[in-house]
Amino acid sequence: MSQGPAPIALTCGEPAGVGVEIAAKLWHRRAECPPFFLIGDPRHLPAGTPHRVIAHPTEAAAALPHGLPVLDHPFDGARVPGLPQPAHAAQIIAVIARAVALTQSGAASALCTLPIHKKALKDGAGFAFPGHTEYLAHLAGQRDVVMMLHLA
């Protein structure tokens, strides 16, 4: 019996930014969406956000009715809304790489990147890419890149 397509992986983006708030709001509209999960630190979610920590993306669909499925990726230090922390840079980059690996393995059907703070990544980890698109191309071993935006 098929369990349906793999869920979509959401990267947390910059914890001090709007990414975790977007993910929390998306959970409230979950009936309109295919299964998804957030990769990040559940401590960074807005206060009161229902969530379920999952060990693997295969648990996302079952967790989704009860709370935002979060594949735990612990960060050092606290989230300070509006104040990007260069100390979080390596963990943010690792979340993106983890999402790519899960997508390439088939554990996630796609990935959606939430906003990063490019200067914090450069200052904190020497991030050598102009943004997500070029880093994703690098991880996928591609030279040519295209960015797609969807506004609903």
Regions found by a protein language model. Give the residues of each.
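Flexible loop/hinge segments that line or gate small-molecule binding clefts
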Residues: P130-A152
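Contiguous, glycine/small-aliphatic-enriched amphipathic segments in soluble metabolic enzymes
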Residues: M1-Y135
